[in-house]
């Protein structure tokens, strides 16, 4: 029986499920599912519809089942800087804001009041981009501290 491995790539404008298997010592890739994606405005903020994305992930898994190609493992790749805050019952806290939203403008200076840019870079090695997670978290700290 063939073994299948599923990679789910969720990008800014679409998501896809790529199924991999080995045949004669070579990797075979097959796109089994694709869906549109994008942020929508919610409460004045560009947000991801995380619940719909979860549904799309499950839809792609159903396609694998229909094809009789059940993956033995699965990996999901998304946008490196976005996140979802959860409460103690695993419920989403607040809006699932996306990196393309402008709410982080000016948050770099707020962060540097706590840790200078040089020290931040020394700790993380990450290039400064105003949409980085640390600036997004500063927005939450400044505007919705009860979520932290």
Features from the language model and the residues they span:
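Glycine-rich phosphate-binding/catalytic subdomain of phosphoryl-transfer
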Residues: 62-148
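N-terminal glycine/serine-rich phosphate-binding loop of ATP-dependent small-molecule kinases
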Residues: 1-95, 122
């Amino acid at each position: 029986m063939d073994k299948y491995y599923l990679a789910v790539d969720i990008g800014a404008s679409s998501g896809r499920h790529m199924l991999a298997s080995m045949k004669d010592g070579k990797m075979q890739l097959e796109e089994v599912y694709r869906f549109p994606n994008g942020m929508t405005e919610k409460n004045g903020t560009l947000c991801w519809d995380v619940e719909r994305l979860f549904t799309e992930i499950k839809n792609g898994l159903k396609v694998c089942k229909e094809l009789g190609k059940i993956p033995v493992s699965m990996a999901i790749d998304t946008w490196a800087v976005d996140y979802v805050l959860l409460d103690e019952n695993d419920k989403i806290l607040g809006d699932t804001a996306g990196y393309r939203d402008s709410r982080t403008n000016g948050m770099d200076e707020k962060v540097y009041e706590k840790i200078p840019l040089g020290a931040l870079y020394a700790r993380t090695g990450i290039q400064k981009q105003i949409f980085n997670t640390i600036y997004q978290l500063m927005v939450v700290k400044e505007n919705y501290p009860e979520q932290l």
